[in-house]
């Protein structure tokens, strides 16, 4: 079987899930390809969409929150959202790509390609099965206006929420968020700490901020470090946010109990 896995360059979680799916499909001797949907648009579409999203979330999170709330409002209207029509513009290009490469199924780990696939189904340009994988622990706005064959959700407790938004319950599969098979391999705490040059027995606080290093990580780090005692360690993960990483390393480079 040959599977096309669609993602979008808006943060790392969607791409990580797509890569995990590809790795698992390859393990079972299926052919799989990961494609950024926006790469089918104009030359700089992917960079513009991804860059705008990352900037908004990391630099102006209040603006992102406002847009999210607007999405919650728009989803109540009986017609399709502007998000749907924006992604529908890539429908013909995606349909041609699928036909030219003879895929047997298509999976998306992002809402945007699900919107595109929905348009394609409506226009009769999609004849292979399509599956959407939700990578958020909530039914975010606009999933309800998509029409995929199945929806993989992170947990069975989310089925009522997705169903209440209009997605047929028989299409909801509570299989979880895809992760790489490597995470299933057991590893001892002692070996991992030695590998990361961390004290083997000291209490450790781990602070994660997503692939983009967003949020008030610097404030949390300062507050946490001020409360460390008796050799407690703090590990701060900044994702791809190199600016934040450099800033925190500069501030805490003299503290042996803080690892950025």
Regions found by a protein language model. Name each.
Residues 20-95:
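Conserved N-terminal ligand/cofactor-binding loop architecture of enzyme catalytic domains
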Residues 6-8, 35, 133, 208, ...:
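Short hydrophobic segments within beta-strands
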Residues 149-212, 241-243:
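A nucleotide-sugar donor-handling region in carbohydrate enzymes
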Residues 1-4:
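Extreme N-terminal starter segment of soluble prokaryotic enzymes
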Residues 25-30, 122-127, 166-167, 226-231, ...:
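Short helix-capping segments at alpha-helix termini
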Residues 189-190, 199-260:
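Donor-nucleotide binding loops and adjacent catalytic segments primarily
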Residues 12, 17, 70-166, 171-174:
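Active-site and donor-binding regions of nucleotide-sugar-utilizing enzymes
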